[in-house]
Amino acid sequence: MSVLHVCMVTRNKSIAATSLHTAMNLHMLCMMRGMHLEIHFVEDKSSLPKLIKSGERMFWMDYGTNLNNEILGKVVDPFDKGVQALVFPSVKEGINWDQFTKKTKAGSKEPVGQRGLEFDTTVGKKLADGLYELDKTSARVWAMDGKPVDKKLRGGKDPIKLPLDSNEAMFTTLKNIGIKVGVASEAIVVCHYTHECFGNILEAAGVELAP
């Protein structure tokens, strides 16, 4: 029986409710396909090398992310066109106001709510409908087949250490060693960005706020 390893990044030992929904939907897909599902709650990528050595499919979800149900089949099914890792692009945090102004002045027909958004992934040539070759990414949601990656990392004279601190550096390394990385352009990734409220800090126990 094949195994799907789902890695979910936690904050303060918790995950977002929408991430949980994605995990539950993946569980149903695995049951339908006769796959074994293992969920790992992680704080970083320190456990990733061990999972790669298992040779099984991995699915990574950063904290506060989820993936639309229509695309979840790509997480569990064999990748198309020889792809060995699949990226699900998402919007970066914040708004690029310079980009928004430039597009607006140029008369862009793009929806107003999207003109200032930047994505974490750029693509190359089209491989198939909804599938593109990766150019560059810092994706927070992705899937990978462990067996070909492990073979490339350990196949040379000197084993290659995969950089884990940066998503961009990790995928750049994967491309450089010959891993074919695809981009699922039809994926909808919703990201929840957390911010510390300054007011909550000031109203902590023992702190008195003057009127």
Regions found by a protein language model. Give the residues of each.
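Conserved catalytic core of nucleotide-sugar-dependent glycosyltransferases
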Residues: 68-158
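C-terminal catalytic/acceptor-binding lobe
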Residues: 2-5, 11-14, 131, 136-211
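Short amphipathic alpha-helical segments and helix-helix/interface helices
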Residues: 48-49, 72-76, 168-172
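Residue-level marker for beta-strand->alpha-helix junctions and adjacent short loops that shape enzyme
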Residues: 9-13, 65-66, 93
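Glycine-rich, basic loop-to-helix element that forms the pyrophosphate-binding segment
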Residues: 40-54, 70
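N-proximal low-complexity "stem/linker" segments adjacent to membrane-targeting elements
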Residues: 1-46
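Short beta-strand-to-loop acidic/aromatic patch adjacent to the donor-nucleotide binding site
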Residues: 55-68
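Short, high-confidence coil segments that cap the C-terminus of an alpha-helix
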Residues: 55-56, 83, 179
